[in-house]
Amino acid sequence: MSLYEKLIAKEAVLAVVGLGYVGMPIAVAFAKKGLNVIGFDTNSKKIEAYRSGADPTKEVGDEQVRNTTVQFTDEEQQLRKADFIVVAVPTPVNFDHTPDLTPVIGASEIVGRNLKKGAIVVYESTVYPGCTENVCIPILEKGSGMVCGTDFKIGYSPERINPGDKAHRLENIRKIVSGMDEESLEEIQHIYDIVIEVGTYPVSDRKSVV
């Protein structure tokens, strides 16, 4: 049984790391399709708001937050249950216009020390070419004690959500998906196709994921 099939059958868990304007809509969209979803954020006040039915991002709306089945948590150990992890933390820009990778590095450290063998980690955060391979993968390997490509897989799907845009939503924007090999690409594409109504655009060139 593929990971996609396990997620559909609720025999696997999907987690979203970073519940801001990108991560929150992703978590709610997958939960709406019946998947077991963990929504993780280090900001305890944000988690409290979501649990109370409030949406500080304004991207989903209070009603959907109240009705969602997403399991909101600030306890990183909950990520050990996850078979498919979406990293959707922000990548702000420094004063010299270089990307501030602090949130991505922090998220990778958290995921790494709680990574389940066989899991797929997909980065949605906007990063420069080579960042996934040179920065993220070593952190994941160090934290987990596992080897990328053997014990877990990596993918990349750049976020395309424009905050406040009510017309162009996650579901109706075609999404680029890539994986480190054909197997991971196929899984990632099938899983994102669950929520992307207009379909995904698979990129098989390995350089696109690193």
List the model feature ranges, each with a label.
Residues 77, 93-160:
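Rossmann-like NAD(P)(H) cofactor-binding subdomain of soluble oxidoreductases
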Residues 89-91, 126, 181:
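Short glycine-/small-residue-rich Rossmann-like dinucleotide-binding loops
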Residues 138-156, 161-210:
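Internal alpha-helical scaffold of NAD(P)-dependent oxidoreductase catalytic cores
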